[in-house]
Amino acid sequence: MDPSSAGAGGNSLASASCGDAQKRRVCYFYDPEVGNYYYGQGHPMKPHRVRMTHALLAHYGLLAPAKMEVLRPLPARGIDLCRFHSDDYVAFLRAVTPETQLGQVRALRRFNIGPDCPVFDGLYAYCQTYAGASVGAAVKLNHGTHDIAINWSGGLHHAKKSEASGFCYVNDIVLAILELLKLHERVLYIDIDIHHGDGVEEAFYTTNRVMTVSFHKFGDYFPGTGDIRDIGYSEGKYYCLNVPLDDGIDDDSYQSIFKPIISKVMEMYRPGAVVLQCGADSLSGDRLGCFNLSGKGHAECVKFMRSFNVPLLLLGGGGYTIRNVARCWCYETGVALGEELQEKLPYNEYYEYFGPEYSLYVAASNMENRNTNKQLEEIKCNILDNLSKLQHAPSVQFQERIPETKLPEPDEDQEDPDERHDPDSDMVLDDHKPTGHSARSLIHNIGVKREITETETKDQHGKRLTTEHKGPEPMAEDLGSSKQAPTADANAVAVNAPGNARNEPGSSPK
């Protein structure tokens, strides 16, 4: 890392180079079927955006073997998903269909399946696909043959151990981090989605082997968590950082707080690997978002993390103006590769989505920035003060490095995809063996954050420990209980059905 870059503004990617000229070994996971999954008419989440991203990458020439290794992921098996999620929740996801859901009202309520997280055709296969890609990417990083691994279909950070949330069913991020922890003593998770990364934070709230850092809109906004006072609990105290932001934050303001905080985190925590969730709903003009980042400002976070030369996993996340999402993730793939891409988009099968400007760059608007310099400075000082109290995570026994082989293609003759075995990944557990000690010790306390009571946050003399603040648990009737905005923009481009594009009336960026 170049320390002098820590104070640079969010528009520095406007220069003709990516700053760090050193090439990185990059692998990219993509399943051609992912764009076919469809949440339903009018739903903001559209997996088709991943297919649009892939098309841009292809026409920019970034899929060539000389640029990066392109891999089709193996679907995650049920037992793999259960490394984090509960058995009954995974069994429900596997069994439920649009036709059978009407008879399972109690289970739907129990697992938080509804308007935000609907049942749709191929739901379980969709979860297997994006989770398998994230875990496969983590395996590649553990092998040491790649410096950066990318899965734009992943990053679904709201899913909990036993429930869906915020368009997310399976938390592929937690599964990927558990994989990385097999080799790395400490893993850093950074979230630049506009929504708080609550599912990942909750999963690792009581451990010091994972540090979570979330930059998000805070207030009457989904999911309603992510208070700056939420700092972790027990062994995880001070290993959880929340950076609450207000509407309209622009590139320069964002980088003025992102770079100093992350620089200090990297100095104090010294992670063996970094997971960066690149939710694109923090871009200007997002259908559900209220930030004002340009595409270059968003990508500056990727560029900055790349400069540390630590194994880096790039994941997708939110993003609901899909022409912006595709351009953002294409641009960030170029940043990961150290490739400068021309501004004018090459002609591709989705070219009409990107008019009238047909530019790779997502521009910021003139919306008001409600984040004052004073507010940002106070937040930064608070976070840096918490970081000053850090102690390095204790050493753990390292596993022997896994020998590198090609990730095998799925066996199409095997009828049940949940029984396919990936010999390249030690992530796949034997059905008849108990979960390994390291995974068990990390996940047995998952859910502790939710169960912390006021009496548990008092010391032995009865004095309340206000530093161990527990953020609000949003109820169904709360303002922030649904991720879907009540209004949308008539100019937003959306997908009506898989592979069938049209303009969706009644949807607009805030």
UniProtKB/Swiss-Prot annotation:
Comment on bound cofactor: Binds 1 zinc ion per subunit.
Enzyme class: hydrolase
Region annotation (Histone deacetylase) ranges: 24-338
This protein's record includes keyword Ribonucleoprotein: no
GO biological process: epigenetic regulation of gene expression
Record-listed E.C. numbers: 3.5.1.98
InterPro entries named in the record: HDAC_PDAC, His_deacetylse, His_deacetylse_1, His_deacetylse_dom, His_deacetylse_dom_sf, Ureohydrolase_dom_sf
Keywords associated with the record: Chromatin regulator, Hydrolase, Metal-binding, Nucleus, Repressor, Transcription, Transcription regulation, Zinc
Pfam families recorded: Hist_deacetyl
Gene Ontology CC terms: nucleus
Localization annotation: Nucleus
Tissue spec. comment: Expressed in roots.
Homology family: Belongs to the histone deacetylase family. HD Type 1 subfamily.
Summary of the function given for this chain in its UniProt record: Responsible for the deacetylation of lysine residues on the N-terminal part of the core histones (H2A, H2B, H3 and H4). Histone deacetylation gives a tag for epigenetic repression and plays an important role in transcriptional regulation, cell cycle progression and developmental events. Histone deacetylases act via the formation of large multiprotein complexes.
Protein name as annotated: Histone deacetylase 3
Species: Oryza sativa subsp. japonica
